[in-house]
Amino acid sequence: MATVPTRSGSPRQLTTKQTGDAWEAQARRWLEGKGLRFIAANVNEPGGEIDLIMREGRTTVFIEVRYRRSALYGGAAASVTRSKQHKLLQTARLWLARHNGSFDTVDCRFDVVAFTGNEVEWIKDAFNDHS
């Protein structure tokens, strides 16, 4: 778990949520630097959450952000399991429906931004509804 200095100078532990939020914010800034445009963050639908939704040109990009301290056990990218992919697909399907769209009518893809230690890996089109 990450630490953050406090006013007293002694570090305090960040919660898992705070750590996740910090990495998601870093991913957003990094992707904006690559030309993507922010739409939404922490989108909740029954059964799941999407970390970031952004646009690249005409493509809606659903982004899962992962962080691991080290590559032990496969690193951050390996932690996006088939079960997690299914939840992301379902959540995106519901979000699109709420915005009058579907996988058939909206050009979209699923990316993973994986932070392992100090390394960042952007996996475009990491999976899809046909995987």
UniProtKB/Swiss-Prot annotation:
Biased composition (Polar residues): 1-19
Region listing for Disordered, in residue ranges: 1-21
GO molecular function: nucleic acid binding
InterPro entries named in the record: Restrct_endonuc-II-like, tRNA_endonuc-like_dom_sf, UPF0102_YraN-like
Entry-linked CDD domains: PoNe_Nuclease (cd20736)
Pfam families per record: UPF0102 (PF02021)
Superkingdom classification of source: Bacteria
Homology family: Belongs to the UPF0102 family.
NCBIfam families: PRK12497.1-3, YraN family protein
Protein's recorded name: UPF0102 protein YraN
Organism: Escherichia coli O81 (strain ED1a)
